[in-house]
Every structure is written in C-alpha cells, then in structure tokens.
Amino acid sequence: MDIGLREWLIVIGIIVIAGILFDGWRRMRGGKGKLKFKLDRSLSNLPDVDDSPELLGPARVVNREHEPSLSENDLPPVTARESSKKRRQDEPYQGDLQLSTEEPVPTLLDPVVGDDDDLQERPQKEQAPVEEVLVINVISRDPHGFRGPALLQNILESGLRFGEMDIFHRHESMAGNGEVLFSMANAVKPGTFDLDDIDHFTTPAVSFFLGLPGPRHPKQAFDVMVAAARKLSQELNGELKDDQRSVLTAQTIEHYRQRIVEFERRQMTIKQR
C-alpha cells in the first residue's frame, strides 16, 4: 500500500519529537539536563527519511463535518493586557504564571541558566519519565516558511527563551525563571535552532509540546501553550495542527484538556495506594 504525503508528514513529525525527547533523556541521565523522557522503543526503529524541508509544508486538510472550526473565543487570549473579566479562571494569559515581577530580566537571546549555588543547595528530585506528550504544530502558509527574525521576535513576546537542547522553552516566569511549562522545537530534523544564523533561518513548521508529568499546573501551562501557538499562527500566517497534522479544532483542544484531567486522576490514584 502506497504511503501518501500526509503519512510521511506524520512520521517525520514523530521522528523529530522523538529525537528531541531522546536527547533530553540522555542529558538527564548524564546529570546535565532538566528534562527526563521515556521513549517508546518502537520509535527508534522508524526509518530515517532524508526528505527535503518542503515536504513539511501545509498538509492536506481532512474535512471533519462534526468538528467546528477554531474560533476566536475557543482558545485562551494571547495578551496579558486585556480585561480579566472576559476569561475563565482556568485559562490564564501568557504572563499569569510569573513567579515575581521584581526578578531581573535576562538578555532575551541568552540561554537560561540557573545559579550553580542554588542548584547545589536545592535537593535533587528525580523526575518521573514522561508518559504523554501534547503537541501543537504551527505550519506556515507561506511557501518560504517562517523567517527567522520574525519567528524569534514572536516567540520572545510569548515568553519563550532559548535554552537546553538548542530549542525554546517557556518557563513559569516571562523572565525565563522557574520550571519549564512547555517547549518549542523546529519541525525539521534535527529539531534545533541556530541563533548565530537566525537572519538566514527559515522553517516550514514548528512544534509546541508539553510533557506529562511535567509542570505543577499542567492545565494552566497547556492554555499558555495554546495561546503562544495561536499568537504565532495569527501574526505569521500559520495554520494550527494537532499531533496527527489535522486541523486543530475546538474539539481537539478540549480533548487535550481531557487527557490532562485523566492523567491527573491516574496520578492521584497512584499516590493513594
């Protein structure tokens, strides 16, 4: 049976994310990373496809008669300056998870690095392997893809900072402090970004992803991730896709939230044993 373009896109997306997760897991094993991921062995057996970046352009849209299109009111707002009366308490703005407004703001392009003394004083917690990964892809409608300077400016405004594994991370604080809420990788292998060549950088797509277990408040972190992806798609002419590269609908967003609820329920059950 012939494999179509859509299937290749899905396979390539899985390979990219799997590679990033494996690198994070390897760094954690070496004591240098903050993220620890448990990879499915089956992903390592996938064939290595050296397709050109053009294959990761906008994918064929699957018509879903029973799924409504994503509207302005379906996703959380993207700016922290709008009135808080219009939002639900469980859908924070992008700046709501800041630890402190008095914290010094680091240089935006510098990798976020913790203080060595603080790291030595804090008890080392063994993080559980990631069991689930929630993914939102943003695919450029422009045949030339997202251009580096515009992409960088957009994600910096959303609070993402360049850091470990040469990808971008959104921390609790917009200043780049606190735990990692979610990350953003290049959808083209090897999934990294080169800030030294950002002026000439282009990519057909990027992938936002959140691992479970991960942030202490995964539902709020997920809403912030949706807001960042939505902002990027609106301002840079992109299209939101789910982990299967299908159009991201309000129903898909709700399904992701339900996965978080179910995961938290399982965690509570395990703790009560």
UniProtKB/Swiss-Prot annotation:
Region (Disordered) residue spans: 61-127
Gene designation: zipA
Function recorded in the entry: Essential cell division protein that stabilizes the FtsZ protofilaments by cross-linking them and that serves as a cytoplasmic membrane anchor for the Z ring. Also required for the recruitment to the septal ring of downstream cell division proteins.
Protein name: Cell division protein ZipA
Membrane-topology annotation of the record: Single-pass type I membrane protein
Membrane-side (Cytoplasmic) residue stretches: 23-273
Species: Stutzerimonas stutzeri (strain A1501)
Transport listed as a keyword: no
Entry's family note: Belongs to the ZipA family.
GO cellular component: cell division site; plasma membrane
